[in-house]
Amino acid sequence: MAGSVLENIQSVLQKTWVREFLAEFLSTYVLMVFGLGSVAHMVLGERLGSYLGVNLGFGFGVTMGIHVAGGISGAHMNAAVTFTNCALGRMAWKKFPIYVLGQFLGSFLAAATTYLIFYGAINHYAGGELLVTGPKSTANIFATYLPEHMTLWRGFVDEVFVTGMLQLCIFAITDKLNSPALQGTEPLMIGILVCVLGVSLGMNTGYAINPSRDLPPRFFTFIAGWGKKVFSAGNNWWWVPVVAPLLGAYLGGIVYLGLIHAGIPPQGS
């Protein structure tokens, strides 16, 4: 009986769509634990964290996530990247919900894990209050929020541009016909790319550049006690890190494929 159950489980786990779902789930979980943990250090730890540390946390979190699942699903860990690959015909649309569901669940669980790990520090920092805005806010550990110097639509354009740069450079790093990263170094190079985007272009919006990075942790804070303000803050900013990266990644992909990839002669020609 036990053997039969194990065989059934093994049979299910060998299905391609199941393996891809689990790969996106686990790789996104790894990315987000490192990323959110680094933000928690910056927000809660006074001198124990820094903005550079946040960029390193997310950058090398991406690297580790690709090592975890790159050979199975490609380790997108980003609904905007998945959307772009589907929209540009590089993967089937039927994979889109499988990938995104895995990413969202992994990100949500990572937010819950971060909350449990830093529960004491979060409560101590704000005197037991769960604040979305203000100098003692802690919701920004989990999701991005629009700063005072930015308007909603400037933030939208910012997210479109930065995500476009992300997707353009990912295509360049992985383009075997151009000048790709050395074999085996792609995870490191993409991680460095994320870090560079953060230190050069991340100030305005916190460079969400990923619906899977922003929306699930935001929803976690909503149900964990921060309340409805996580969606209403910043003139209802919440939808921008969901929609703008989809548009930005698509445009960045088109720019690279149209201006660079299409002009590369086939190998052997």
Curated annotation (Swiss-Prot):
InterPro entries: Aquaporin-like, MIP, MIP/Aquaporin. GO terms for biological process: glycerol transmembrane transport; renal water absorption; response to xenobiotic stimulus; spermatogenesis; urea transport; water transport. Keywords: Cell membrane, Cytoplasmic vesicle, Lipid droplet, Membrane, Phosphoprotein, Repeat, Transmembrane, Transmembrane helix, Transport. The record marks Y119 as: Important for permeability to glycerol. One of its GO terms (cellular component) is basolateral plasma membrane. Phosphorylation by PKA could prevent the interaction with PLIN1. Glycerol transport is regulated by pH, with the porin being permeable to glycerol at pH 7.4 but not at pH 5.5. Water permeability, however, is not influenced by pH. Not inhibited by mercury ions. The modification Phosphoserine is found at S4. The keyword Cell membrane applies. A motif (NPA 1) lies at residues 78-80. It is a multi-pass membrane protein. The chain crosses the membrane at residues 21-38, 52-69, 96-116, 152-172, 185-201, 238-259. Residues 39-51, 117-151, 202-205, 220-237 are extracellular. Residues 74-87, 206-219 dip into the membrane without crossing it. Detected in heart, kidney and testis. It catalyses: glycerol(in) = glycerol(out); H2O(in) = H2O(out); urea(in) = urea(out). The keyword Isomerase does not apply. Belongs to the MIP/aquaporin (TC 1.A.8) family. PANTHER family: AQUAPORIN OR AQUAGLYCEROPORIN RELATED, AQUAPORIN-7. Homotetramer; each monomer provides an independent glycerol/water pore. Two homotetramers on opposing membranes can dimerize, forming a cell-cell junction. Interacts with PLIN1. This is Aquaporin-7. It comes from Rattus norvegicus (Rat).
